[in-house]
Every structure is written in structure tokens, then in C-alpha cells.
Amino acid sequence: MKMNKLVKSSVATSMALLLLSGTANAEGKITPVSVKKVDDKVTLYKTTATADSDKFKISQILTFNFIKDKSYDKDTLVLKATGNINSGFVKPNPNDYDFSKLYWGAKYNVSISSQSNDSVNAVDYAPKNQNEEFQVQNTLGYTFGGDISISNGLSGGLNGNTAFSETINYKQESYRTLSRNTNYKNVGWGVEAHKIMNGWGPYGRDSFHPTYGNELFLAGRQSSAYAGQNFIAQHQMPLLSRSNFNPEFLSVLSHRQDRAKKSKITVTYQREMDLYQIRWNGFYWAGANYKNFKTRTFKSTYEIDWENHKVKLLDTKETENNK
């Protein structure tokens, strides 16, 4: 029988917000611009930029595809955002007796925003809408005259008139993708835990049982094990909750040629870590999940040179937000 000595959680004792931010040096790698002439109308310019936060274990890999189309009166940039966002997973202490906790990667957010007034707008993006598939796959195609098409799969929807195409392909087991804060200046996505199987599941971040609370990662309701050993095995947790998320998102930006030749964009990668805890009340185990308990955000700001089809990393910023 477990002793009925319960350790008060940090949630109950303090919900104060700790905000820590820092501006890192604007260091990164940018590849030389490669040029590909499709025909007498369309020329493609491609460069890749990387920026990392070693502190947060977040890596941004951005591929800039400039499309110069003589049959279209605007410049087009297809930006592919890839890289890595670590979950921030912290495993429980196996020696915890009647109360224990872990931190897990519950949601990953990516956004691309234009900092220009009206010269640069976001005109398309992928993926769109809500997507609960295990594997998300889209193909973007550009045809002469500025026509953009986005189709499901890695090749569907392309035809002989396609001057440029780009694909995205990522896995999100037990998670789902949502569009967020999307307008003509910003496109964003959130990949969040949705249906996690654990015995009586599926469970989510907000699941609740009147007796056992949120059993998201609880191994046994009546287990005689120590608290720190009464979580499901780490390998049974979804990969995104305990390891890394490898994003692949597309944004299409349009630039008016009669306006400023340079503009700025900001790319944001973020993880939301939830606090999950279990406690013994003398009769059974109960779990609780506290959403967005720790947030780690990494931003990079780039200057886009539309005339010369180049990019320059201006600044990076790391922000911590703890409850």
C-alpha cells in the first residue's frame, strides 16, 4: 500500500511566468545561388540557408526558390522550411515513490511571416487545412504566368506545362497538422498530439477521466511500482513526443516588381512541452497533463534581395517561456 503523502506539484504552488530571451549572433550558412534556365521565359534561382539554436536543439534549413517568369508581372519565391525540432523530452526519475513527472513534446509550431508593408504577400502554402494522416505528402507546381497548384502525394497533379515543382513529406504518428495564424502576411502550422493509444485510449492533451484523470502515459491504475516506474515504456510513446520532429512546409511569396527590391521575412520554429504527472492517492494512480508548460522558440530574420535572388541572415533570437 502506498503512503498517502502527496508532493504538491509545481503547477499548484506557482503559475508564475518566467520569460527568458536572448539574441544570438546572426550566424548561419548560405549556399551560393544556383541558376537553371527552364526556357526563354522562366529562370530558377536556388539557395539554401541554415540557422541553428544549439541551446534549444532546433535547426532551420530553408530552401529559397526564386522564380523569374517573363510572362508574369510579379516575382515568386517558393520557400521550403525543413530541419529539426527536438522534443525537449525529460524522462521521469525512476526512484520517485508516490509522485512523478515527465516533460514531453506536445506541439510543434512553424511560421513564415513577411515584414514588408504591401510589396510582399503570402499567396499559397502547403499543407492546408487539418491533416490527420500518418504521413503528410504534397506537391506544389508552378506553371507559366504565375499559376500555383498544390496536390496530394509526391507527384500527382503535374503536367507538361509545369516549370517548377517542390514536395513535402513528413511523418506525424498520433499527431495532426493544423493551419494557424494564416493570412496574406503570415503562414503557420501547428503539429500537435491528437490520438495517442495507451490501453484504453486514444488519449490527447485534454483527456480526462473523473477517477483516473488523464491516463496519457500512465502504465497501471493499480500498479505496485514506484511512481517513476509507472509510466508506459519510452519506446511505446509516439516518436514526436520523445524524440524529434522534422518539419517540411511550403510557403509561396509574391513580390511586386515596382516596389522595394529588398524585403524581410521572419521564420519561427517552436516547441510546446507539456508537463505530465502521476500520483498515488492511497487507492489508485491518477494522471494529469498541463499544457504548454515550457515553450522554446527560435526565430531567424532574413533579408530577401529580389533583384539579385539572394538572401542574408540578419538576426536570430531564442526565447524561453516557463510556467
UniProtKB/Swiss-Prot annotation:
Signal peptide annotation: 1-25
The cellular component terms of Gene Ontology attached to this UniProt record, alphabetical and capped at eight, are: extracellular region
UniProt xrefs under InterPro entries: Bi-component_toxin_staph (IPR003963), Leukocidin/Hemolysin_toxin (IPR016183), Leukocidin/porin_MspA_sf (IPR036435)
Explain the purpose of this protein: Leukocidin causes cytotoxic changes in polymorphonuclear leukocytes. Gamma-hemolysin causes hemolysis in red blood cells.
Q: Which gene is transcribed and translated to give this protein?
A: lukF
Which molecular-function annotation in GO is an example for this chain?
toxin activity
User: What name does this protein carry?
Assistant: Leukocidin-F subunit
Q: Which domain of life is it from?
A: Bacteria
User: Quaternary arrangement and interactors, per the entry?
Assistant: Leukocidin consists of two protein components: F and S; gamma-hemolysin consists of two protein components (H-gamma-I which is identical to F and H-gamma-II).
- Keywords, ordered alphabetically: Cytolysis, Hemolysis, Signal, Toxin, Virulence
One example of a Gene Ontology biological process annotation: cytolysis in another organism
Is Cytoplasm included in the keywords of this UniProt record?
Answer: no
- State the similarity comment: Belongs to the aerolysin family.
The answer, when asked if Signal is one of the entry's keywords, is yes
